[in-house]
Amino acid sequence: YKISQRGQLMEPDEQHIRFIERIEPIVDKLLFIRGGNHDMIRSVNILGFDVSKVMADMIGVPYFRLPGYSIVRICDRKWKLVSGHGKSGAKNGDTELDKMAAVYSEGDVFFLGHNHQLYAKPLDSLRISMKEEKVHRRWYCRGGSFLKYADYARYRFYPIVRAGWVTIEFGEKEIKTWTN
Protein backbone atom coordinates (compact mmCIF):
# COMPACT_ATOMS: atom_id res chain seq x y z
CA TYR A 1 0.00 0.00 0.00
CA LYS A 2 1.51 3.33 -1.04
CA ILE A 3 0.41 6.60 0.52
CA SER A 4 0.20 9.49 -1.93
CA GLN A 5 3.01 11.98 -1.43
CA ARG A 6 1.09 14.72 -3.29
CA GLY A 7 4.05 16.20 -5.09
CA GLN A 8 6.60 15.89 -2.29
CA LEU A 9 10.19 15.82 -3.48
CA MET A 10 11.34 12.89 -1.31
CA GLU A 11 9.93 9.55 -0.31
CA PRO A 12 9.06 9.23 3.42
CA ASP A 13 12.13 7.15 4.34
CA GLU A 14 14.41 9.67 2.64
CA GLN A 15 12.63 12.54 4.43
CA HIS A 16 13.22 10.79 7.75
CA ILE A 17 16.93 10.23 7.07
CA ARG A 18 17.49 13.81 5.87
CA PHE A 19 15.62 15.24 8.86
CA ILE A 20 17.78 13.30 11.33
CA GLU A 21 20.89 14.57 9.51
CA ARG A 22 19.65 18.17 9.63
CA ILE A 23 18.91 18.21 13.36
CA GLU A 24 22.16 16.49 14.33
CA PRO A 25 23.82 19.82 15.35
CA ILE A 26 21.06 20.59 17.88
CA VAL A 27 20.23 17.13 19.21
CA ASP A 28 21.94 17.96 22.52
CA LYS A 29 19.39 20.77 23.02
CA LEU A 30 16.30 18.59 22.47
CA LEU A 31 14.49 17.59 25.66
CA PHE A 32 12.01 15.18 24.03
CA ILE A 33 9.82 14.57 20.99
CA ARG A 34 6.02 14.75 21.03
CA GLY A 35 3.81 13.08 18.45
CA GLY A 36 1.59 15.03 16.10
CA ASN A 37 -1.07 14.81 13.44
CA HIS A 38 1.12 13.78 10.51
CA ASP A 39 2.62 10.76 12.22
CA MET A 40 -0.78 9.72 13.65
CA ILE A 41 -2.70 10.11 10.38
CA ARG A 42 -0.11 8.52 8.16
CA SER A 43 2.34 6.23 9.89
CA VAL A 44 0.42 5.11 12.99
CA ASN A 45 -3.16 4.82 11.71
CA ILE A 46 -2.32 3.31 8.33
CA LEU A 47 0.86 1.34 8.99
CA GLY A 48 0.91 0.83 12.76
CA PHE A 49 4.38 2.40 12.77
CA ASP A 50 5.12 5.46 14.92
CA VAL A 51 7.82 7.39 13.06
CA SER A 52 8.19 9.96 15.87
CA LYS A 53 8.79 7.24 18.44
CA VAL A 54 11.50 5.71 16.25
CA MET A 55 13.06 9.14 15.68
CA ALA A 56 13.16 9.82 19.44
CA ASP A 57 14.84 6.46 20.00
CA MET A 58 17.39 7.15 17.24
CA ILE A 59 18.50 10.44 18.76
CA GLY A 60 18.21 9.28 22.38
CA VAL A 61 15.45 11.48 23.76
CA PRO A 62 12.15 10.55 25.46
CA TYR A 63 9.00 10.26 23.34
CA PHE A 64 5.51 11.38 24.37
CA ARG A 65 2.57 10.67 22.07
CA LEU A 66 0.17 13.16 23.68
CA PRO A 67 0.38 16.75 25.02
CA GLY A 68 1.40 17.22 28.63
CA TYR A 69 3.68 18.62 31.29
CA SER A 70 7.46 18.44 31.38
CA ILE A 71 9.42 19.57 34.42
CA VAL A 72 12.57 21.55 33.65
CA ARG A 73 14.94 21.81 36.63
CA ILE A 74 17.48 24.62 36.85
CA CYS A 75 19.37 24.39 40.16
CA ASP A 76 16.61 24.40 42.82
CA ARG A 77 13.98 25.87 40.48
CA LYS A 78 11.35 23.74 38.74
CA TRP A 79 9.62 25.14 35.68
CA LYS A 80 6.57 23.51 34.08
CA LEU A 81 6.62 23.37 30.29
CA VAL A 82 3.32 22.30 28.71
CA SER A 83 3.70 21.23 25.11
CA GLY A 84 1.90 19.47 22.31
CA HIS A 85 1.77 19.39 18.56
CA GLY A 86 -1.52 21.24 18.24
CA LYS A 87 -4.34 20.55 15.81
CA SER A 88 -6.16 23.77 15.03
CA GLY A 89 -5.55 25.80 11.90
CA ALA A 90 -7.41 28.79 13.37
CA LYS A 91 -6.21 32.28 12.59
CA ASN A 92 -5.94 33.15 16.30
CA GLY A 93 -3.22 30.83 17.66
CA ASP A 94 -3.96 31.90 21.24
CA THR A 95 -7.34 30.14 21.20
CA GLU A 96 -5.76 26.69 21.25
CA LEU A 97 -3.16 27.84 23.80
CA ASP A 98 -6.01 29.13 26.01
CA LYS A 99 -7.62 25.66 25.88
CA MET A 100 -4.29 24.06 26.77
CA ALA A 101 -3.75 26.47 29.68
CA ALA A 102 -7.24 25.70 31.02
CA VAL A 103 -6.44 21.97 31.16
CA TYR A 104 -2.79 22.27 32.27
CA SER A 105 -3.28 25.22 34.61
CA GLU A 106 0.06 24.94 36.44
CA GLY A 107 2.17 25.64 33.35
CA ASP A 108 4.83 28.32 33.08
CA VAL A 109 5.30 27.95 29.31
CA PHE A 110 2.64 26.74 26.85
CA PHE A 111 4.05 25.61 23.52
CA LEU A 112 2.22 24.38 20.41
CA GLY A 113 3.14 23.89 16.78
CA HIS A 114 0.91 22.74 13.91
CA ASN A 115 -0.43 26.02 12.54
CA HIS A 116 3.03 27.37 11.51
CA GLN A 117 2.55 30.64 13.40
CA LEU A 118 5.72 31.92 15.03
CA TYR A 119 5.60 33.88 18.26
CA ALA A 120 6.56 33.93 21.92
CA LYS A 121 4.68 36.34 24.13
CA PRO A 122 4.33 36.90 27.86
CA LEU A 123 1.08 36.67 29.79
CA ASP A 124 1.30 38.50 33.08
CA SER A 125 -1.08 38.05 36.00
CA LEU A 126 -1.11 38.94 39.68
CA ARG A 127 -0.59 36.47 42.50
CA ILE A 128 -0.66 36.94 46.25
CA SER A 129 2.35 35.61 48.14
CA MET A 130 2.99 36.28 51.85
CA LYS A 131 0.63 39.31 51.86
CA GLU A 132 2.38 40.73 48.82
CA GLU A 133 1.08 41.12 45.31
CA LYS A 134 3.53 39.83 42.69
CA VAL A 135 3.50 39.73 38.91
CA HIS A 136 3.50 36.15 37.66
CA ARG A 137 4.73 35.72 34.08
CA ARG A 138 3.77 32.81 31.86
CA TRP A 139 4.52 32.37 28.17
CA TYR A 140 2.49 31.48 25.08
CA CYS A 141 4.59 30.12 22.21
CA ARG A 142 3.71 28.93 18.72
CA GLY A 143 6.58 26.96 17.26
CA GLY A 144 6.87 28.25 13.71
CA SER A 145 7.77 26.43 10.53
CA PHE A 146 10.53 25.93 8.02
CA LEU A 147 8.17 25.82 5.04
CA LYS A 148 7.94 28.80 2.76
CA TYR A 149 4.45 28.66 1.21
CA ALA A 150 3.41 25.06 0.74
CA ASP A 151 0.88 24.04 -1.91
CA TYR A 152 -1.70 22.95 0.67
CA ALA A 153 -1.46 26.40 2.31
CA ARG A 154 -2.01 28.11 -1.05
CA TYR A 155 -4.97 25.87 -1.78
CA ARG A 156 -6.65 26.80 1.50
CA PHE A 157 -5.65 30.48 1.29
CA TYR A 158 -3.71 30.29 4.54
CA PRO A 159 -1.79 33.46 5.30
CA ILE A 160 1.89 33.58 4.45
CA VAL A 161 3.90 33.30 7.68
CA ARG A 162 7.56 33.88 8.33
CA ALA A 163 9.78 30.83 8.75
CA GLY A 164 11.70 30.28 11.97
CA TRP A 165 11.55 28.78 15.45
CA VAL A 166 11.15 29.68 19.10
CA THR A 167 13.98 29.44 21.62
CA ILE A 168 13.07 29.03 25.29
CA GLU A 169 15.79 29.61 27.89
CA PHE A 170 14.96 28.43 31.40
CA GLY A 171 16.98 30.22 34.06
CA GLU A 172 17.16 30.05 37.82
CA LYS A 173 15.12 33.24 38.22
CA GLU A 174 13.28 33.72 34.94
CA ILE A 175 12.33 32.30 31.58
CA LYS A 176 13.39 34.04 28.39
CA THR A 177 11.85 33.31 25.01
CA TRP A 178 12.49 34.69 21.57
CA THR A 179 11.84 33.90 17.94
CA ASN A 180 14.57 33.15 15.42
Model-derived features: where do they sit?
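A generic local structural motif
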Residues: 21, 69, 95-99
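Generic structural signal for beta-strand residues in well-ordered domains
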Residues: 24, 63, 74-76, 103, ...
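Conserved beta-sheet core of the metallophosphoesterase superfamily
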Residues: 80-81, 87-177
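An acidic, phosphate/nucleotide-engaging active-site surface
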Residues: 43-94
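Core catalytic region of metal-dependent phosphoesterases/phosphodiesterases
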Residues: 1-64
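A general structural motif
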Residues: 27-30, 78, 106-107
